């Protein structure tokens, strides 16, 4: 029997990067014994049934203080922490320009996707 995927909140780590200067993502458990704790850090994260989450109070603090604070990320079921060949539309979030995650090419709000892949080339959804 295959274990049930764990729901996680994944965000770009503001204090750590790969040795090559590429982004590093923190994976925080939303359920189970490690709920609320960072369970892994990786440069590659594949999620299923994912959606963007922006905490309004954090977004307002960033806008007010003009300083980075972790307040946004992607919530979904953790599938893999390994590099993937993934094709999808680029997803972006800029707290100074947007209230939510958006599709980078159209600026349309990102409402969620079946699969989301976070990697050194950014966030992509399919």
From Swiss-Prot:
Superkingdom of source: Viruses
Protein name (database record): Gene 82 protein
Highest classification ranks of the organism: Viruses, Duplodnaviria, Heunggongvirae, Uroviricota, Caudoviricetes
